[in-house]
Amino acid sequence: MFDSTLNPLWQRYILAVQEEVKPALGCTEPISLALAASVAAAELEGPVERVEAWVSPNLMKNGLGVTVPGTGMVGLPIAAALGALGGNANAGLEVLKDATAQAIADAKALLAAGKVSVKIQEPCNEILFSRAKVWNGEKWACVTIVGGHTNIVHIETHDGVVFTQQACVAEGEQESPLSVLSRTTLAEILKFVNEVQFAAIRFILDSAKLNCALSQEGLSGNWGLHIGATLEKQCERGLLAKDLSSSIVIRTSAASDARMGGATLPAMSNSGSGNQGITATMPVVVVAEHFGADDERLARALMLLHLSAIYIHNQLPRLSALCAATTAAMGAAAGMAWLVDGRYETISMAISSMIGDVSGMICDGASNSCAMKVSTSASAAWKAVLMALDDTAVTGNEGIVAHDVEQSIANLCALASHSMQQTDRQIIEIMASKAR
């Protein structure tokens, strides 16, 4: 429940964060397909004997090389099988949180028997599309997700249509929080962060708790490329400084290591991505600890980073050729700059420098190597903050960076939304040729 005295715009900010910052177990593209399969299985009469699935090229790209939690296996087929046999249809992005050892074994057996197929949907005009059809004899159920990782638009069985999402907005219905956010500015977001009641945003502290637990798992286990653990060892060997900069990179990349390596711990996601949530959150948590920030100060920094990351990513396609760890790290830069300095000018300079630094990084699918990009983005964010604290930043005379941070963001997002579409097609073509 909201305080009725709360600024209506601020209420929409909070709703936007609650919609876009959610726990997610496993990489969200395979999880989206697992959710479709799980919901379909819940509609099916009898046990699942066969699974057929179709996904958009972008979802295929992000599902080819990532480990599905608890299975030790990579790819969309195991995600679809486990979703159908062991998923919790009501758990959203945590659909696999209750999967048992028996369900995992059954899913692997279904896969080994050749009863699971995942193909690219053709034609497909959607960036994010997943459809799962499960069978029991001649009986079947089919679920389609479009536009968002949990946005179910159609459910159908052999008996007929069960559910279809209405395309139109009902008369009098409130505008979505993301639509409101798209018309705001970073300055307005900062005003909200500085002035909102702590009680209204205390919930965001959970994002620090979840991602810190994932980071600790990444440092204690042998997950993915174990970048965080490796860099921590280099600190002990004297090859890397034991300082704040190293700690930011180590703890952030460790969380991504665990997530991409298949750890059965949820990440607090941002904009439908666990890695984006990790990249935005962990650098700020480390800096907050360094300065001894209390819960209220940390919560305000977390709201700033999450809203900034959502605000930027909302101007992009849900999935694209641009590595979104870079835009999430712009949120981290905002949060860290606020903790150290608090000035709008410092925050905007840090984001501008980020755009001038890592904006060309491509997304070549979800995999263990995502942790490399997460670590690079986190490092770049702290570098940009340090520059801004010295009143230095990439200026509007250089590259795609403009004199105004809002225009710089728009320039970056235009690049990803339009010019990089051909890049995305080339990446998908290369990855598809490897999978043949």
Curated annotation (Swiss-Prot):
InterPro entries xrefs: Ser_deHydtase-like_asu (IPR005130), UPF0597 (IPR021144)
Gene Ontology biological process terms in this record: L-cysteine catabolic process to pyruvate
Record GO terms (molecular function): L-cysteine desulfhydrase activity
Cysteine-cysteine disulfides: none
Pfam families tied to this protein: SDH_alpha
Family per similarity comment: Belongs to the UPF0597 family.
Name under which the protein is recorded: UPF0597 protein YhaM
Provenance organism: Shigella dysenteriae serotype 1 (strain Sd197)
